[in-house]
From Swiss-Prot:
Pfam families named in the record: FAD_binding_3, Rng_hyd_C
Annotated protein name in UniProt: 12-dehydrotetracycline 5-monooxygenase/anhydrotetracycline 6-monooxygenase
Binding site for FAD: 13, 32-33, 44, 99, 123, 160, 288, 301-302
Pathway: Antibiotic biosynthesis; oxytetracycline biosynthesis
Cofactor: FAD
Cofactor binding summary note: Binds 1 FAD per subunit.
Entry GO MF terms: anhydrotetracycline monooxygenase activity; FAD binding
Highest taxon of the lineage: Bacteria
Function according to Swiss-Prot or TrEMBL: Involved in the biosynthesis of the antibiotics oxytetracycline and tetracycline. OxyS starts by catalyzing the stereospecific hydroxylation of anhydrotetracycline at C(6) position to yield 5a,11a-dehydrotetracycline (12-dehydrotetracycline). If the released product is captured by OxyR, it is reduced to tetracycline. However, if the released product is recaptured by OxyS, it performs an additional hydroxylation at C(5), producing 5a,11a-dehydrooxytetracycline, which, following the action of OxyR becomes oxytetracycline.
Subunit structure: Monomer.
Catalytic activity, reaction form: 5a,11a-dehydrotetracycline + NADPH + O2 + H(+) = 5a,11a-dehydrooxytetracycline + NADP(+) + H2O; anhydrotetracycline + NADPH + O2 + H(+) = 5a,11a-dehydrotetracycline + NADP(+) + H2O
Keyword terms of this UniProt record: Antibiotic biosynthesis, FAD, Flavoprotein, Monooxygenase, NADP, Nucleotide-binding, Oxidoreductase
Length: 503
């Protein structure tokens, strides 16, 4: 069987991409080198923009049902929470969702939609030509080949797909070296000088340029991190042992606090790298395969998730033959600058969490700035991805920005705009008047849904004064209309983002 898309990697990025591709009708195979799902969670939360995207695909309730809401974001553990409440969002918070649970929910959805998932199958080689990609795979029963139109590497920072393509992964080497343990502790952890509200337990050692910080994962289980700066690991390839963590705790905090029942051990650095390019012909990269960074502010999983939602509808339309020729190129053009921005802000945070006394003045100044509403909002927009704006033709300030989840007044009552995106199609939203827009957009009705609303239930929304919006499947506004503009530019926007009209 020839697949439309093969995805290497069944982490959150690969699984969400599989869901998006199946909604577009693409025959999708996910290959995961690990034989079983992992039982530990590197990432622990989803930010506001990711929650919005989950709502748009009908997945929001599953994530929110059991997840605590974190109302304040975190920047460099400086103790001043980021305020999400100033954004026009129904979700001014992050959700505390362990990555294990995120992957469970996304796996279930991908399989329900018809994606095929093979665990214990590793990509080992690839060859591509103008017609497709041949992927060499090693599975439990030996090597075999898979044919597909496109291959997407969602296989992490050490991406095999990226290496097979020979794509450079330039960036900055680490100066922070940490060990992590998810464990129980018999002794009370020190409250002292922690790392802000998200890490209420901790010890800062300016003399050692080191710190210990911990936060609860569940009752009596904590994630403990001990970080040293400019003190490289003796052997970075060696697995972390309990003794490594005990020794680090004792050196920095004076005790290992009776650490026991260890669930997970790992290393952490502030290495930051970005792939030189995200695409080579019919092979693309997404998620950690094209960017890695210090996991400060919980941005990594969310960055990859949003890569998947940006890429999925574009690749699906390309496979369906409805996409304009340049559409797939906009994936890298839009997402690469966003990832570069995340690398910049995490590099800045890496300096701010370094306890070197030389940086104390910088930390104090940054704390003052975080109390300035405009600065706080700017950083909250970065961390949550609520303030992303893609390059878009036109002058209206909403172009290229996410559409808020508006409560629409319809003939059937009030309904949230997000519910119209469950099928991952474009939406032409009219507010009070749908003619002649419906006629002009009729030739795209196989790709774009017309949603006619009488208006918005909440006064003072971001769309006040507009009569219509064209919104891409990923929730970003690509055309607006006001009474004075009429339908000017609608056909051009439809062609740009959804291809030529149906015959």
């Amino acid at each position: 069987m020839r697949y439309d898309v093969v995805i290497a990697g069944a982490g959150p990025t690969g699984l969400m991409l599989a869901c998006e591709l199946r909604l577009a009708g693409a025959r999708t195979l996910v290959l995961e080198r690990l034989a079983e799902p992992v039982d530990f969670s590197k990432a622990l939360g989803v930010h506001a923009r990711t929650v919005e995207l989950l709502d748009m695909r009908g997945l929001g309730e599953g994530f929110q049902a059991e997840a605590p809401k974190l109302r304040g974001g975190n920047f460099a553990s400086l103790g001043v929470p980021l305020d999400f409440s100033s954004f026009d969002t129904r979700h001014p918070y992050a959700l505390f969702v362990p990555q294990v649970r995120t992957e469970e929910l996304l796996t279930g959805r991908a399989l329900e939609l018809g994606a095929e998932l093979r665990r214990g199958h590793a990509v080992t080689a690839l060859e591509q030509d103008a017609d497709g990609v041949t992927v060499s795979v090693t599975g439990p029963e030996g090597p075999y080949e898979v044919e597909c139109a496109y291959l997407v590497g969602c296989d992490g920072g050490g991406s095999t797909v990226r290496k097979l393509l020979g794509i450079d992964f330039p960036g900055q080497d680490p100066h922070m070296f940490a060990v992590i343990a998810d464990a129980r502790f018999r002794e009370e952890l020190p409250h002292g000088e922690g790392m802000g509200p998200m890490r209420p337990y901790g010890v800062m050692r300016h003399d050692l340029r080191a710190w210990f910080a911990a936060f609860p994962l569940e009752p009596d289980v904590y994630r403990a991190t001990v970080a040293f700066f400019d003190r490289p690991y003796a052997d970075r390839r060696a697995p972390v042992t309990e003794e490594d963590v005990r020794a680090a705790l004792t050196e920095v905090a004076g005790s290992d606090f009776g650490m026991h029942d260890v669930r997970w051990l790992s290393r952490l650095t502030d290495t930051s790298r970005q792939a030189e390019r995200y695409r080579d012909g019919r092979v693309l990269l997404a998620g950690d395969a094209c960017h890695i960074h210090l996991p400060a502010g919980g941005q990594g999983l969310n960055l990859g998730f949003q890569d998947a939602v940006n890429l999925g509808w574009k690749l699906g339309a390309t496979i369906a033959g409805t996409a304009p020729p340049e559409l797939l190129d906009t994936y890298e053009a839009e997402r690469r600058p966003i990832a570069a921005g995340v690398l910049r802000n995490t590099r800045a945070q890496a300096v701010l969490i370094d306890p070197d006394p030389r940086y104390e003045g910088l930390r104090e100044l940054m704390i003052e700035l975080l109390h300035v509403p405009e600065t706080n909002r700017y950083l909250a927009g970065l961390i949550s991805a609520l303030d992303v704006r893609y390059p878009m033709a036109g002058e209206h300030p909403l172009l290229g920005r996410r559409v808020p989840d508006l409560p629409l007044v319809t003939e059937d009552g009030t309904r949230q705009l997000s519910t119209y995106f469950h099928a991952a199609r474009g939406v032409l939203l009219t507010l009070g008047c749908d003619q002649p827009l419906a006629d002009e957009a009729a030739a795209w009705k196989d790709r774009v849904d017309l949603v006619a609303a009488e208006g918005v239930a909440d006064p003072g929304s971001a769309v006040d004064g507009l009569t219509a919006l064209l919104v891409r499947p990923d929730g970003y506004i690509c055309w607006t209309a006001a009474p004075e503009t009429g339908t000017d530019g609608l056909t051009d926007a439809l062609r740009t983002w959804f291809g030529p009209p149906a015959m």
